[in-house]
């Protein structure tokens, strides 16, 4: 029969295990912060308690818009400014992709019959531009139309017109879970093909591999200096930068990092959904 000391040790070990399981189920870290900034980089936590935080866009006034990808009409778009959080729009089902153009926000709902929405920041009115299968990534093509990805096994890149025409045009099909994307001024579309671990480029009927051997690449963004930033949506995810043909890790140990945005001061803003928080990253050498 075990002694009192052994029984106490077993009790406290079991209690610790229960606490860890409950914390994991709640989406909170069960261990101290394990995010590692590589040499030359530093980060800090700006805002906490942002469940489902996903994609980000930076406004000209320095405020940040973000989607909170919550299901069944609980999803919302919020505005973060000087530490404050304001709800901009609600009633969405898993709002994911986010784009800001002038007074309009464009939002995608990542559900089987997900809407691509245009939301007027001034009038607060919205209209449905298209209904697609798991729409996620969104950006503007050089001619003003939208390009949207469908996050599915037989996924597509689609052209969605902003003029109210309901018809959509297939740009590229047969993809394996395309997610985040960015359109370049020359018409090329850079996108993450999550299931294959690749970032691809599509232009004029030609597909090229930009980066491969990644672990569930999720979002991609092009910084003002032309470098390509990538997040890996895993429990031990990374924030990556591709510059001048060299891929480097900026942060590791992230929990499901999602969207990025760039500040006018060279900062990088990052949604870390797994820890329900917003980070800001700076290069220590001001690069």
Model-inferred region functions:
Residues 31-50:
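A short helix->beta-strand "capping" segment at the edge of beta-propeller domains
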Residues 49-61, 74-75, 91-109, 113-115, ...:
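Beta-rich, blade/repeat-based domains predominating
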Residues 68-78:
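Beta-propeller domains
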Residues 80-84, 119-124, 161-165, 202-206, ...:
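Short loop/turn segments that connect beta-strands within beta-propeller blades
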Residues 24-29:
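Boundary at the C-terminal end of the N-terminal hydrophobic targeting segment
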Residues 2-15:
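Bacterial N-terminal signal peptides that target proteins for export
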Residues 42-47, 84-89, 124-130, 166-172, ...:
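A short beta-strand motif characteristic of beta-propeller blades
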Residues 13-23:
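Bacterial N-terminal signal peptides
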């Amino acid at each position: 029969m075990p002694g009192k000391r052994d029984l106490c040790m077993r009790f406290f070990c079991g209690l610790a295990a229960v606490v860890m399981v409950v914390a994991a189920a709640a989406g909170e870290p069960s261990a101290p912060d394990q995010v590692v900034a590589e040499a030359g980089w530093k980060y800090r936590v700006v805002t906490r308690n942002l469940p489902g935080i996903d994609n980000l866009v930076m406004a000209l006034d320095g405020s940040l818009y973000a989607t909170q990808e919550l299901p069944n009409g609980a999803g919302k778009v919020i505005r973060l400014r000087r530490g404050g959080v304001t709800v901009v729009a609600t009633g969405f089902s898993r709002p994911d992709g986010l784009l800001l153009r002038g007074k309009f926000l464009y939002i995608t709902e990542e559900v089987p019959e997900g809407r691509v929405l245009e939301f007027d920041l001034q009038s607060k009115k919205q209209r449905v531009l298209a209904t697609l299968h798991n729409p996620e990534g969104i950006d503007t093509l050089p001619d003003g139309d939208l390009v949207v990805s469908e996050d599915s096994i037989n996924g597509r890149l689609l052209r969605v017109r902003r003029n109210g025409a309901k018809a959509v045009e297939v740009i590229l099909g047969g993809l394996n879970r395309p997610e985040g994307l960015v359109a370049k001024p020359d018409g090329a579309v850079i996108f993450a093909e999550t299931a294959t671990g690749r970032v691809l480029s599509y232009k004029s009927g030609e597909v090229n591999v930009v980066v491969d051997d990644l672990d569930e690449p999720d979002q991609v963004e092009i910084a003002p200096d032309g470098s390509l930033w990538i997040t890996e949506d895993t429990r031990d995810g990374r924030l990556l930068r591709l510059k001048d043909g060299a891929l480097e890790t900026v942060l590791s140990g992230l929990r499901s990092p999602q969207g990025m945005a760039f500040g006018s001061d060279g900062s990088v803003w990052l949604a870390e959904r797994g820890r329900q928080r917003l980070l800001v990253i700076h290069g220590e050498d001001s690069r």
